[in-house]
Swiss-Prot record:
It is found in: Plastid, Chloroplast. The lineage of its organism: Eukaryota, Viridiplantae, Streptophyta, Embryophyta, Tracheophyta. InterPro entries: Glyco_hydro_1, Glyco_hydro_1_AS, Glyco_hydro_1_N_CS, Glycoside_hydrolase_SF. Homo- and heterohexamers. Belongs to the glycosyl hydrolase 1 family. This is 4-hydroxy-7-methoxy-3-oxo-3,4-dihydro-2H-1,4-benzoxazin-2-yl glucoside beta-D-glucosidase 1d, chloroplastic.
Amino acid sequence: MALLAAATLNPTTHLSLRSRAGRNSENLWLRSAASSQKSKGRFCNLTVRAGTPSKPAEPIGPVFTKLKPWQIPKRDWFDKDFLFGASTSAYQIEGAWNEDGKGPSTWDHFCHKYPERISDGTNGDVAADSYHLYEEDVKALKDMGMKVYRFSISWSRILPNGTGEVNQAGIDYYNKLINSLISHDIVPYVTIWHWDTPQALEDKYGGFLDPQIVDDYKQFAKLCFESFGDRVKNWFTFNEPHTYCCFSYGEGIHAPGRCSPGMDCAVPEGDSLREPYTAGHHILLAHAEAVEMFRTHYNMHGDSKIGMAFDVMGYEPYQDSFLDDQARERSIDYNLGWFLEPVVRGDYPFSMRSLIGDRLPVFTKEEQEKLASSCDIMGLNYYTSRFSKHVDISPDVTPKLNTDDAYASSETTGSDGNDIGPITGTYWIYMYPKGLTDLLLIMKEKYGNPPIFITENGIADVDGDETMPDPLDDWKRLDYLQRHISAVKDAIDQGADVRGHFTWGLIDNFEWGSGYSSRFGLVYIDKNDGFKRKLKKSAKWFSKFNAVPKHLLGTTKPTGQAPV
């Protein structure tokens, strides 16, 4: 997706995550809960990647500066098994919104009924037309030397009503895509759900606000495993549940567009302080059910993997103070921890339980057991970082959004007046590669060093950016990606178990609330020339980067059991 963080610039709004590794301050509440929230330690016998040590990049100033030649990452910095690829999602690229038996999704409904909620009034009816042009997408991946394509399944394309009758034409489409990828030596990584719930289920019982969604999602996942599992070995159950819950049920700026009465959203009939947690709870329960089913019945290869893809944001304390250190810890808990802690340890972070109270649903013991250690792999979608600033916890402060519950504001500028990094063409993305390195080390040190894929990472070309007049000369994206690939290598050198980097996105597509005015693709879509795919400068760089023969690359080095 590319996280459209429309609210990250609001100082009282807190969207996403992370922080500096290596700082010893702990969350005040977590100290008292540490003994009861130890990981069950599923992640063991992991590997640390070997390769030529990378050259550290110079500090980034307030503007984009190109790396020195010796700082540009090389493929042989990474071992032969490290995977480079690109990601997309169904609604953003496929088009064909009502063709061949497909049913409407919540995003079809949202864009058609509330076009004013999209900045340019557009929709995904045609998008990049990948339903018809998927072979061109595969060709672009092959031309770049990419080894992985991460894409999502449209629930309403294969189950038009969300349940019941299967649409064989939808199954056939994904079979053709998967077979084409494999024939070109590209590995499919499948996201089962990427925000586009069938509208039929939204109309029937409110979608993810109702517990019925858990079983319906399980049946959808079962159909995916049965239809594609003979060729697909790597699965993500959900993509970016944190952003989905905050934007769809808190602020209401994404489908289905719900928020509290009196707020400015498409459907001001919800509860912005409760519904995000209700929807998130059902997502976690659906994940647990799907994973248990997969491990019991559908691990057809014996070594197939399943996990979840989390949206993440790096965090630094606003200033060097105890209170801002604690704010940073709460920021981590309320964003990364909200969905990560349950799938690792079986419950929400203690700080969330302390501050949210009865608005946060409770797991049964059986649910906790199913959730704990329910990810074989984890995806992290990283774009940017923020400073975290303490907000006084007081009975006089009444949260209006669930994102206020952390009592930590998200700032782009620190106490010294400097931005956290140079702003990109996209107003919410400030380039801060260190945030990615730090986040990966947090995963290593706090969460048992799970196998991680960077499942999204990139920036957008935007309308009106005079520094990039040529749509194919995306020099900012190239610099951004080079620095973040180097940041991944820095984390690997310090022991983080990172297995791959997937750029967001493969092609220019429909970017949710920004429509087509914000374009994240490595590949340009020329809509005036039959939606022809044209490689941008960054894509051509990947073609050279990935051209190193595999036999010249190193191999992994096994380590002992990961820390827990």
